[in-house]
């Protein structure tokens, strides 16, 4: 049976080890919580009409970690594009269809149902679409980021 000195020592160790962690969690000025009702959606001009963005953390236009939600309407087509940075994507709702390649080929599209996680390497040509439902996905990466279209005519930011 442990002595009372050992028990007190163990309790003191636990208190001393846990206190800085609890203190750090309680005092973190960067702690953020966003519930769906608080999302602020706005048009995403770098993607075809109908795409929307909600910034959850950081800024995709500035250096540092960012997390965004992207909302795409049903029957949305995203032309061949790439990103200069590495990113991770998680599908929140709806089924997203995506493929790697520098030419749209519907037979290559893979379904990404809700909950699907994917790692997207930098500078990889890809294309995507939604079908009969709206899709929301989360992107986390290190900014600044951008989207580059293989065919300049597909870039909605450029005058037609």
Predicted segments with their positions:
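His-enriched metal-coordination microenvironments in redox/metal-binding proteins
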Residues: 47, 60-65, 79-90
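Double-stranded beta-helix
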Residues: 30-33, 107, 127-160
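Glycine- and acidic-residue-biased ligand/ion/polar-headgroup-sensing regions
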Residues: 73-76, 82-103
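Bacterial N-terminal signal peptides
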Residues: 9-19
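Short beta-strand His + acidic residue motifs that chelate non-heme Fe in jelly-roll/DSBH
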Residues: 78-80, 98-99, 120, 125-131
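A short, N-terminal "cap"/entry segment at the start of jelly-roll beta-barrel domains
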Residues: 23-66, 153-160
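Conserved short histidine dyad/triad with adjacent acidic residue
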Residues: 66-83, 111, 121-122
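Short acidic-glycine-tyrosine-enriched beta hairpin
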Residues: 96, 102-123
